[in-house]
Amino acid sequence: MNEKNWKEKVFVLLKKFRISNSVLWQIYKPFSRILNFIKHGDLYFFRSVAIEISTSCNRTCYYCPNSLEETPTNFIAQETFNKIIKQLEAIKFSGIVYYHFYNEPLLDKRLPNLIRYVKKHLPSCINRVVSNGDFLSVELADDLISAGVVDFAITIHDLDGEKLLRKLEPVIKKYPGYFMIDSLHGKALSNRGGAIEVETLDKKDTCTDPLELLQFDYKGNVLLCCNDYYRKHPFGNLAHDTLYDIWKGKEFSELRRELRKGIASLEICRICMGKE
């Protein structure tokens, strides 16, 4: 099993006391901002990275654009994945790494080995798997945790989640400090990717999504954020741009400054923030 860094040890310890993800995030935020200012001279440098390792999901939830579109199954090329990680290694990235966009990460059989590669090159990162839990078994959890995962965020999409919870009980019992279970039902919906129309959306005065998380698709494109399902707003590709050049690019930088001030110049942002 990979040796945990100190952040991972603290993360698992706090979760054993059932401290919620939102509280953990609030604890992590100020620390990461100070660290990013020291390392990059930028308080708002991204502290999380999400990599779309495939486009495949086994579910077609009504509130997800996957229910509206027939998406071909594509997998990130190993070369593209390695390039992303190597660029993150070059800037000494030490934040959180996710393995999803609108996909189910556990459908990619390469996931444990991808995480091992990340752990080798980004030893100070926290590896986090966001999943619907449908394919998670004790054996797979063993492999993923051995590879370097310290957190599973399982989202229950069914109205009655008892069946899934019963299925996951042996895994959670074996690794009590590694799981956070959440349900989408009973909460205000966000208009993810523009898939749903509801009378009341969560309204935002400002948006920090593109500031906090850098979203890669399977082709190596850097997208606006996790809501850009249709990939309408790419800001660069690691095939011909460096990570720093993309992040510090004029258009991307100006958009992030505007969003910090509550200015939504793009339609996707106005819809997401409840301004349209």
Name each region found by the language model.
Residues 51, 55-58, 201, 263-266:
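Processing junctions and N-termini across compartments
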Residues 57, 61-64, 207, 225-226, ...:
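Short cysteine clusters
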Residues 2-9, 170-198, 227-276:
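C-terminal accessory region of radical SAM enzymes
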Residues 63, 67-70, 213, 231-232, ...:
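Secreted/processed peptides and extracellular or luminal domains of membrane proteins
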Residues 86, 108-212, 217:
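Conserved AdoMet/S-adenosylmethionine-binding subsite of the radical SAM
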Residues 47, 210, 229:
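Exposed loop/turn and edge beta-strand positions of beta-sandwich/beta-sheet ligand-binding modules
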Residues 3-152:
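Conserved alpha-helical substructure of the radical SAM core
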